[in-house]
């Protein structure tokens, strides 16, 4: 199965989370995982993927302009139904606790529903998500005054999302 992680990152925080998600997905030996910054991401690759995970820093509860511009170029895939039944998931980082993580993830999920994708999040019984995460995807607060780019909890949450997407995608593609 092929999984594509696409991210926008301005201060490297979201890049670290994207890499953790890719690591988690790669724990499944059947997964071939690709990861690209949005500036290098090729929308033509999407129709060959089984799962697509995209994310960005949250900007006042909405998608970063770089990822939004990229998503807005997916209209022809929508018109041709190329992403229908592909697994989708999202992730986000913000600088503050109330920086709009969940609203940003809602905004990231919406285009996936328009494309007919099967969106997966992180259920509450996933240990990494129980006290730290969000049901909508991997959302991590990365305070600007911290010396570390990403907390260990954030990295574990990213890996958990990657594992979940890989597991669900494997289950859905096993019968094909």
Curated annotation (Swiss-Prot):
Named from the GO MF annotations, one term is: NAD(P)H dehydrogenase (quinone) activity
Cross-referenced SUPFAM superfamilies, in alphabetical order? Answer: Flavoproteins
State what protein this is by name. Uncharacterized protein YhcB
Q: Which InterPro entries match?
A: Flavodoxin/NO_synth (IPR008254), Flavoprotein-like_sf (IPR029039), FMN_Rdtase-like_dom (IPR005025)
Name the species this protein comes from: Bacillus subtilis (strain 168)
Q: Which Pfam families match?
A: FMN_red
Q: Which cysteines link up through disulfide bonds? A: none
Q: Where is the Flavodoxin-like domain?
A: 3-162
Which PANTHER family has this protein been placed in? FLAVODOXIN-RELATED PROTEIN WRBA-RELATED, FLAVOPROTEIN-LIKE PROTEIN YCP4-RELATED
Q: Name one GO cellular component term.
A: membrane
Q: Which gene encodes it?
A: yhcB
